[in-house]
Amino acid sequence: MPTLTDPAVIKELLQRHGFSFSRALGQNFIINPGICPRIAEAAGIGPGWGALEVGPGIGVLTEQLCKRADNVVSIEVDKRLPPLLEETMADYDNFKLVLND
């Protein structure tokens, strides 16, 4: 999967899936390539750990968590995002998405 912090990759992914941001959900996705690895590192997550993420968006932080934790469970309320996450997280068998509010 190409880098999820590349604006061109993000734009193409969102357009392909017909996704537009929801103001009602207050959606803002992290795209700074240096932030997510630092967040995952600061959380101290490593082998033997699990991670629970609320609001994975397109999976930028999720990807970093999956690289470190044994299991990652992400909870998403936007019913439009699972197809995007299925694509962006396809390489990670330690990822599980829960669609719930």
Q: Each PLM stretch: what is its role?
A:
Residues M1-D101:
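Catalytic cores of RNA-modifying enzymes
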